[in-house]
Amino acid sequence: MSQAYSSSQRVSSYRRTFGGAPSFPLGSPLSSPVFPRAGFGTKGSSSSVTSRVYQVSRTSGGAGGLGALRASRLGSTRVPSSYGAGELLDFSLADAVNQEFLTTRTNEKVELQELNDRFANYIEKVRFLEQQNAALAAEVNRLKGREPTRVAEIYEEELRELRRQVEVLTNQRARVDVERDNLLDDLQRLKAKLQEEIQLKEEAENNLAAFRADVDAATLARIDLERRIESLNEEIAFLKKVHEEEIRELQAQLQEQQVQVEMDMSKPDLTAALRDIRAQYETIAAKNISEAEEWYKSKVSDLTQAANKNNDALRQAKQEMMEYRHQIQSYTCEIDALKGTNDSLMRQMRELEDRFASEASGYQDNIARLEEEIRHLKDEMARHLREYQDLLNVKMALDVEIATYRKLLEGEESRINLPIQTFSALNFRETSPEQRGSEVHTKKTVMIKTIETRDGEVVSEATQQQHEVL
């Protein structure tokens, strides 16, 4: 009996749970529970099925477990073969057996008290673990029900805000690109207009150079004509002098002829001849003078007209040149203003691009940070779920241990409450090992609990018990 209780004492829930299950010999009253654990589904699997099998073995007697156990325990006392079944023992042997039985009962009471104390401590620890398990289950449920939803809502809200800002920035960038394209078109058009104005300026400069050549030629012609006029005036003056000298000479000759005529009154035809000659010379001189004056006047009028025409052309060329200069200056100012505007717009566009790039990088960093936080929260949830599953496994093992201890206590209480028979009326019989083996049998209860999980959540549970008699 003490050996049976010592073996049952070795079957401790604390040792089985935390110190490993001891090995029991064949035929012990209690075999350790078997907890085969199926591995959890790895990350990414849609569902997993976890099965746990609990094996509880209980030894019961054929006619009565206690009687068989007591008979097998007391059967070790060698009884002489001369005594038959049903014969009484002598009182000395009965006293010895009674004393041994009382000692065994006292030891059993002490051991049972120790086991009760240990069992009370074990119950307290189980209650504490159940409280922790309930707190962790509540925490897991809270995390399942609230925290992921709130984080998802915050993430979705920030993601929508970031998408809206990205759309606004994209629209602004598209608008800036359109404005830039329009400005580039205006710049190209102004460049084409500038090229046309430059070509017109070059043509005006070429015309001005041609006009300058014409003016120079007209100036040279005018100077030449002025020199010719001077030479003609000098020639006219010289001819006048020559004519006057000829006239004086002719007058002197006429006077001499008149003197001779007066001296020679006998020659009246000479005076008439001189008069005719003088008239002829005067006619010729007047004709030459009139022709020279007409030629001079015609030349002067031609030169004056040419000079006036050249002066008009020069004045018109100067006016056109001034207009072209004013246009070039206005176009140059306009081009400078457009260049400044283009530079400012390009600078603004670069600043906007840099700002958009920095904001986009900031948004990307925020998105990466939020994704990292979500991943961290998911890892925390998975860790809490694993801890919860482990605690659930421990709880189920403890439940099985408690049930086992309850069965043991019920068996001990039923054994203690049995009436103690008078040893004088006890009939002892010797049983052989073959008979004890036929009387003792083992009843094994197999509990199969199937838990189906999907993505870390318990979907369904199923419990099945199988009883086998060994």
From Swiss-Prot:
The modification Phosphoserine is found at residues 7, 12, 28, 31-32, 45, 60, 81, 290, 358, 361, 424. Residues 109-141 are annotated as: Coil 1A. Residues 269-287 are annotated as: Coil 2A. Residues 108-416 form the IF rod domain. InterPro entries: IF_conserved, IF_rod_dom, Intermed_filament_DNA-bd, Intermediate_filament. Gene3D superfamilies: 1.20.5.170, Single helix bin, Vasodilator-stimulated phosphoprotein. The modification Omega-N-methylarginine is found at residues 16, 37, 70. Residues 296-412 are annotated as: Coil 2B. Residues 438-453 are annotated as: Interaction with CRYAB. Muscle-specific type III intermediate filament essential for proper muscular structure and function. Plays a crucial role in maintaining the structure of sarcomeres, inter-connecting the Z-disks and forming the myofibrils, linking them not only to the sarcolemmal cytoskeleton, but also to the nucleus and mitochondria, thus providing strength for the muscle fiber during activity. In adult striated muscle they form a fibrous network connecting myofibrils to each other and to the plasma membrane from the periphery of the Z-line structures. Homomer. Interacts with DST. Interacts with MTM1. Interacts with EPPK1; interaction is dependent of higher-order structure of intermediate filament. Interacts with CRYAB. Interacts with NEB (via nebulin repeats 160-164). Interacts (via rod region) with NEBL (via nebulin repeats 1-5). Interacts with ASB2; the interaction targets DES for proteasomal degradation. Interacts with PKP1. Interacts with FLII. This is Desmin. It comes from Bos taurus (Bovine).
